[in-house]
């Protein structure tokens, strides 16, 4: 029988303080996230479908804008409009039937990005993102479907290998600064 999904974009961004107030996050966890953001570490958010990965990434984006320099240039890449960024200097690029995320990541390098954010990595674009983050563009964030933090790193490696390369564990270790599950 027919089936379809309706994705409803959030009407507001819940800041990290909301996570603390509702007991979803401790003060120490929020401070760890803030520290990672301030130190421009790349953040990988993992979880299952509907677990709140994108909602948390929007909170992280909000914190990046709050803690960062007004001149920071954010490039947001996604296939479905879900990310919300209040930065004055941001550009959102979307996939099309003819342009995939891997192509967008490569194009992003010509846009002088300070922070590269991908809504969700699902394929070979993982390798391009890791390379971009590791070549002068730290401080990004993305999501991946995984059952725990270790599985998230393994999944990122599997996705990078879809580009036809061997395991990228060393690159992942050098590039990903924090995994949130």
Say what each PLM segment does.
Residues 30, 37-49, 55, 59-175:
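Switch/coupling sub-region of P-loop NTPases
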């Amino acid at each position: 029988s027919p089936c379809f999904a309706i994705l409803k974009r959030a009407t507001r961004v819940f800041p990290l303080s909301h996570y603390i107030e509702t007991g979803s996050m401790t003060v120490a966890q929020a401070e760890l996230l803030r520290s990672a953001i301030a130190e421009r570490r790349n953040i990988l958010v993992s979880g299952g479908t509907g677990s709140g990965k994108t909602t948390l990434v929007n909170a992280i984006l909000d914190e990046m804008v709050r803690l960062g320099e007004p001149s920071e240039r954010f490039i947001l890449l996604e296939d479905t409009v879900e990310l919300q960024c209040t930065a004055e200097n941001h550009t959102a690029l979307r996939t099309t039937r003819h342009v995939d995320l891997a192509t967008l990541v490569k194009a992003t390098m010509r846009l002088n990005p300070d922070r590269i954010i991908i809504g969700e990595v699902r394929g070979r674009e993982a390798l391009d993102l890791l390379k971009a983050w590791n070549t002068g563009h730290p401080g990004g964030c993305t999501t991946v479907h995984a059952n725990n933090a270790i599985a998230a790193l393994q999944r990122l490696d599997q996705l990078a290998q879809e580009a036809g390369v061997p395991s990228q564990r060393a690159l992942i270790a050098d590039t990903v600064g924090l995994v949130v599950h």
